[in-house]
Amino acid sequence: MAAKTPAQWKTLFENVPFHRENYYTGPLGPDYAPGGTCLRLWAPTAEAVTVTLYHKGDGGAVLGTKPLVRGAHGVWSIWLPGEQHGRYYTFAVTVNGITRETGDPYARAAGVNGVRSMIVDLARTAPSGWERDVRPTIPPAQRAVWEVSVRDFSQDAASGVRPAWRGKYMAFTQQGTTLHGDGIHPTCLNYLKRLGVKYVQLMPIFDFGSVDEAKPLLRQYNWGYDPTNFNVPEGSYSTDPTRGEVRIRECREMIAALHAAGIGVVMDVVYNHTYRTENPLNNTVPYYFFRQNADGSFSNGSGCGNEFASERPMARRYLIDSILYWAKEYHIDGFRFDLMGLYDAESINAVRAALDSLPGGRDILLYGEPWQGGASQLHRYEANKANLAMLNERVGIFCDDTRDAIKGGCFDAREPGYVEGKPGSFWDIGAAVAAWCRSDRLPPHAPSQIVSYVSAHDNFTLWDKLLCVRYEKPEFTARDTVALAQNRLAAGIYLTSFGLPFMQAGEEFARTKKGVGNSYRSSPALNRLDWNRAEQYHALVDYYRGLLALRAAFPRLGSTDRRAPEALQFFALEQPLVGWMLPAVWGDGAAWSALCVFYNPTDTTRTVSLPAGQWKLLSDGTSSSLWRGQSRVFTNKAPLAPYSATVFGAV
């Protein structure tokens, strides 16, 4: 039989009978038991499949090669008798007369650089007390996400983390770290507990291909948005990437330590593409898992060379299986989808439904980027902003409308936003406060669908953006009082808005990457969190800390009710001031019966009239913790400092 062309494979895989004949619902991957292990591989187009066994994850002698037997629905399998924990393996899959050696797409462990898969008894990788680890219960009003790379978190020698754990999973487990070990200024986990964020979003932690795990990491760096093995933790973050079980145990220890601190873990997942097309998915069933152009070439909506075909039944099943695996075996508390606009909405809703079926699964967060990285061949309803109405109300999106309204556009370094004085932007600030629930632009099902933010790993840090707007040639490491005030104002807006607050790690201490807007493979020194800045800008850190606590003390801001923003009462003020009042919900435990909030993006003090009653000053342009003490009470008019968010509580 003549070999199929890529275009012919595309035609076959878009054929309903193919899916009817080959869709499979049974177990896949390694099924370990002490008496033996069954390997199962879905490869319906394969002519032959063999497995080669190894004692080591890299190099070493071959222990043997055995054929797999084809069964129903294109599933190949083999039973390996005896104890197989720690045994490494690869498949050789023959399709179209071409044989490709590959790892197992369903592998749960792997050797160095993820080339060889490993059979693992997950029970042996459980850290002490893992069976008692539970997801922390975090009320909506307390939810705020802090995004960080495992590497960036502790790479700085000033972090106080022991050298062997810097840039590793284990850094999250070290208690009581302080700046240079001074015993005074907290860093890492110690710092997070004090700051008050309740979720840490980890940039990709599943096995990625851009860092050579076999080489020293001193000069290697990558964010990790180039996955290789979707169900295996990244090895460069472990203390020993050559032993497949170590990365699993240490990743779990990291998660358990965060949970013990009352912090949930959000996993940044990148199923939308792979590092190379020569990966376990494509080597097993060539062309099936990736979208194709009309000529059979790979579509490139990710901007990285390929894009995952989530709409195909077994691809969707793989996506759901992988998400559930991380949720169940790693106790993950949330998932952030990179380029979620490259998935069809039906698949994302199916992921949400699958998570909801787990015990406590309805509390697992799910949100993503509602855009693509290029032209896509996805011709179904994309999970993007335009189709927000088609997504489950507990699927959230990053709101670039909020981001750009507050600080200015991302693609022009000098374009200002509201906090830098952009004319007319106050209209969008009002919409952002209401999480766009009162706008026709992108009305969500619920305010909690909107992820409100001003900085993430992509594009400029907030500090760098503020300086780029202010100066043609900014000095990023110089202290700037106006930029600091604008930073506080930006935080004051999104942390007093409806929606899910999100921040890039270090935003709260004026993190700078010295004007580098895309540092995905820049030096470790540029990307690391500079813990000295947390001390140098401690007043800014305290401002974020106070706002997070203030928000938690007024639960209505975290409401998941679509109608909640309708209670906002906006004031008619002189432009560009924005002001609003929001009554509390009776019985929700709010510290005040109402909030009254004003934003002043100008360089002069303004005076505003307050609603009738007595209003305690809770937060102003420099301190967000006034509410903790005996602060001033206003009854008529009140001043607004330049570049400030000012918050009052009804007493």
Which residues make up each language-model segment?
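Carbohydrate-binding surface patches
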Residues: 31-47, 569-611
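C-terminal beta-strand-rich structural cap/linker in extracellular carbohydrate-active enzymes
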Residues: 43, 85-89, 630-651
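Glycan-recognition and catalytic regions of carbohydrate-active enzymes
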Residues: 21-26, 496-516, 528-595
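Conserved, mostly hydrophobic/aromatic
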Residues: 41, 91, 148, 202, ...
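Substrate-binding/active-site clefts of carbohydrate-active enzymes
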Residues: 151-330, 339-359, 365, 377
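The feature marks proteins involved in alpha-glucan
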Residues: 1-34, 62-63, 70-174
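Beta-strand-rich binding/interaction modules
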Residues: 41, 47-58, 62, 605-622
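Conserved alpha/beta catalytic core and glycan-binding cleft of carbohydrate-active enzymes
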Residues: 120, 352-353, 358, 362-505, ...
